[in-house]
């Protein structure tokens, strides 16, 4: 027994007196460096432009006080507020919102005050991930130039850390979208809370001594706020003031540049403002009045001229437009004819010039080939832009033919289903009837909605109805929901009127 103790003592002494070299510790030093797990995105992953693996809610629990009843990580509190369950087995009475491939966030009924406080800590990383993985791809055109797509997203994630207004704008947009997906009232209230915080932070930033025209975080926050008004819920009436703020910043930033736009973000910002000017001033067809068109037209002409002479406006950039995707002149012509229809006044512009533009787009439609199936196309996204442009050109043609100087204001009138414009539009819709990418592309929302007013045949209306419903199912944008309601109400009124005749 004594010999064993001596041997053990000798081994211990030898181990203690031996020198530990750098090579002995090298395996321990070569562990993979983890993300710093900072909100909204870790700096190392953000700078490397790689996917950031965010910690799951369970990874952030301090288990030392887990059993304490007042701990925010107490098991009962988690069960009452938010629980993460397997996606395969949600309960029928629960509101389910898909977050990623492996998990589903299940929101139980909560009191609003509890929802805003208890849910925020757990939800904000997940909401940010929803913005990155799902929402962002719906507010920028599919297949746009990679410098636009990845560049703007990387910039948003970088600026969120230092711009609280941008951080809350991102949360507001993503949370409102989650509300549309899951129809959870608490998520809508939470989205409006984030929206209010973003407005507060913006106000503080604007009164501080600074140069707003050089602040990309400020402009991005404003862009997301008017996108929230357009695509989200509860802030539609705020869009004009956000647009006016963005227009003022862009004017200060770009109007005096003789060489045009040389930064991709500025190009994207100008296109975004033009699209939402179009959205706001066109409004719903049943609205007899709307925003003052004259207050936007000067900005539109200057912005259009700026984009035309921009160094970013190369042929490859035009094919990969981040927001508009069709010729801006066609966009403007559709806006002009829609405005004339609303005001029911003689146009104060050169009618001959408008007629020449309309005939030019009609010749383009006649000269282009019949729509091919998407499987035959070498560039699907390019086909999206081309066919969306054809739909706008068809609308311009139909509006021009219905334009009378003193006609009654209101929606477009029905036309015969056999006319060439309607046949061409139906061909385009049937081409993409199984293409979800097309239905997610937001530039097709307005022409699909507008063409529904021209349809007279039941089968043609059915095509439009299916297309609009598919767009709602795939995007959950409030814009599409408003369009569907307006179109269906008009169809019902026309059927009722025809029944009385």
Show which residues each predicted segment covers.
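Residue register of alpha-helical TPR repeats
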Residues: 169, 220, 266, 271, ...
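Acidic/serine-rich, low-complexity amphipathic helices located in mid- to C-terminal regulatory regions
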Residues: 125, 227-339
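C-terminal transcriptional activation/regulatory domains of eukaryotic transcription factors
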Residues: 98-213, 284-285, 311-318, 371-386, ...
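Cytosolic regulatory protein-protein interaction regions
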Residues: 11, 15, 148-151, 155-158, ...
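Hydrophobic/aromatic-rich effector regions of fungal transcription factors
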Residues: 153-159, 171-184, 193-236, 246-252, ...
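C-terminal amphipathic "assembly/sorting" segment characterized by alternating charged
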Residues: 456-501
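Charge-rich, intrinsically disordered regulatory segments
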Residues: 1-159, 163, 383, 390, ...
């Amino acid at each position: 027994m004594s010999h064993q103790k001596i041997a053990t003592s000798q081994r211990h002494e030898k181990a203690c007196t031996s020198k530990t070299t750098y090579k002995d510790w090298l395996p321990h030093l070569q562990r993979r460096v983890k993300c710093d797990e900072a909100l909204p995105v870790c700096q190392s992953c953000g700078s490397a432009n790689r996917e950031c693996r965010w910690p799951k809610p369970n990874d952030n629990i301090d288990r030392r006080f887990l059993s304490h009843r007042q701990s925010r990580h107490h098991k009962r509190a988690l069960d009452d507020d938010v629980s993460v369950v397997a996606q395969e087995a949600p309960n029928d009475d629960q509101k389910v919102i898909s977050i990623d491939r492996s998990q589903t966030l299940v929101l139980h009924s909560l009191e609003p005050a509890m929802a805003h406080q208890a849910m925020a800590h757990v939800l904000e990383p997940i909401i940010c991930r929803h913005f990155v993985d799902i929402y962002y791809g719906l507010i920028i055109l599919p297949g746009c130039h990679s410098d636009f797509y990845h560049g703007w997203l990387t910039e948003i994630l970088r600026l969120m850390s230092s711009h609280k207004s941008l951080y809350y704008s991102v949360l507001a947009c993503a949370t409102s979208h989650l509300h549309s997906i899951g129809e959870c009232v608490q998520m809508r209230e939470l989205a409006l809370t984030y929206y209010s915080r973003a407005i507060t932070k913006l106000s503080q930033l604007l009164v501080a001594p600074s140069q707003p025209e050089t602040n990309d975080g400020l402009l991005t926050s404003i862009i997301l706020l008017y996108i929230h008004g357009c695509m989200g819920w509860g802030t539609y009436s705020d869009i004009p003031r956000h647009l006016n703020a963005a227009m003022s910043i862009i004017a200060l930033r770009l109007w005096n540049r003789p060489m045009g736009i040389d930064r991709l973000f500025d190009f994207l910002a100008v296109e975004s403002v033009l699209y939402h000017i179009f959205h706001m001033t066109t409004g719903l067809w049943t609205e007899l009045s709307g925003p003052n068109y004259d207050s936007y037209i000067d900005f539109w002409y200057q912005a259009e001229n700026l984009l035309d002479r921009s160094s970013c406006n190369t042929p490859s950039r035009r094919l990969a437009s981040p927001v508009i995707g069709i010729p801006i002149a066609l966009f403007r012509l559709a806006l002009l004819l829609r405005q004339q229809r609303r005001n029911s006044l003689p146009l104060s512009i050169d009618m001959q010039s408008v007629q020449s533009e309309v005939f030019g787009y009609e010749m383009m439609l006649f000269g282009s080939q019949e729509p091919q199936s998407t499987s035959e196309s070498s560039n699907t996204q390019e086909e999206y832009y081309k066919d969306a442009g054809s739909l706008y050109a068809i609308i311009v043609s139909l509006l021009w033919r219905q334009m009378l100087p003193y006609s009654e204001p209101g929606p477009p009138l029905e036309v015969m289903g056999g006319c060439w414009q309607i046949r061409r539009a139906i061909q385009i819709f049937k081409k993409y009837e199984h293409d979800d990418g097309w239905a997610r592309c937001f530039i097709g929302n307005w022409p699909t909605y507008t063409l529904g007013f021209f349809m007279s045949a039941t089968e043609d209306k059915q095509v439009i109805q299916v297309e609009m419903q598919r767009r709602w199912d795939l995007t959950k944008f409030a814009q599409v929901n408003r369009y569907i309601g307006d179109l269906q109400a008009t169809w019902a009124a026309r059927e009722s009127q025809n029944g009385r005749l």
